[in-house]
């Protein structure tokens, strides 16, 4: 279980937490639970899904994780998200799959019942774009520079960072697409599916978008994420639905 603040610098154009930011939190809380049940082995996220029901949030958001399945090779976790500031209203549902990695020298046991109080708001917070090293721009390609603080214990880019890159890249792509009527007005990502294919280690990492077309509830964008510093290898593939207000 984890609480996520809904501060101004974390919000999208519609008035809710960025879908990519929410997936970052989900990756953390779900991954922590998966890490507990996979001990003494380690885990790495292989896929994340998000279905957003309520798009405007008061906060804090409560993320509650439940193990759906623990196997030898993977752990599947359900994360349910509610808005404590809106009387516990349902916000989103996510399913994540983590691959189990054998450790040559197991880390110390991960404790259960750990409590970390939510930190108070920063007086001068850094925007999501700046914190995650996402370069300004528009069009079908969005770039992220990997900072050391964005790496996990395996030395690779956090899955949440790739989710946020996919979110912002998809919104930029829809806004710049001349075949849609959503160039103006508020947009946000609502539904996301992210499959992690290989580790991103060097960077820069690019989200390369293809606008697949419109459906009644929004525009679907495919985001291919590549590590330009390692033979332009594809490291993730995402499908993102971008919706107007």
Predicted regions: what is each one?
Residues 3, 7-8, 45-47, 88, ...:
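Generic secondary-structure boundary/loop-capping signal
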Residues 44-46, 70, 75, 130, ...:
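Short, basic and Ser/Thr-rich N-terminal targeting/leader segments
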Residues 14-17, 30-62, 67, 171-206, ...:
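Hydrophobic beta-strand-centered segment that forms part of the acyl-chain substrate-binding groove
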Residues 39, 54-121, 196-206, 212-245:
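HotDog/MaoC-like acyl-thioester-processing domains
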């Amino acid at each position: 279980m984890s609480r996520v603040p809904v501060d101004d610098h974390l919000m999208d154009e519609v008035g809710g937490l960025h879908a990519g930011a929410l997936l970052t939190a989900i990756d953390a809380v779900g991954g922590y639970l998966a890490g507990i049940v996979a001990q003494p082995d380690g885990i790495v996220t292989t896929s994340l899904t998000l279905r957003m029901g309520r798009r405007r949030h008061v906060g804090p958001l409560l993320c509650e994780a439940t193990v759906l399945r623990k196997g030898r090779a993977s752990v599947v976790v359900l994360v349910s998200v509610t808005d404590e500031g809106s009387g516990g209203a349902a916000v989103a549902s996510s399913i994540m799959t983590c691959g189990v990695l054998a450790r040559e020298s197991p880390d110390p046991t991960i404790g259960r019942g750990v409590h970390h109080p939510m930190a108070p708001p920063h007086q001068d917070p850094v925007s999501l774009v700046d914190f995650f090293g996402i370069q300004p721009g528009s069009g079908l390609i969005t770039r992220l520079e990997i900072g050391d603080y964005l790496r996990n214990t395996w030395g690779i880019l956090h899955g949440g960072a790739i989710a946020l890159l996919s979110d912002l890249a998809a919104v930029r792509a829809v806004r710049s697409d001349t075949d849609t009527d959503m160039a103006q007005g508020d947009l946000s990502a609502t539904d996301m599916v992210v499959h992690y294919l290989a580790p991103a280690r060097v960077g820069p990492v690019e989200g390369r978008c293809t606008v697949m077309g419109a459906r009644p509830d929004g525009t679907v964008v495919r985001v291919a994420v590549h590590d330009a510093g390692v033979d332009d290898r594809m490291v993730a593939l995402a499908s993102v639905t971008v919706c107007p207000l």
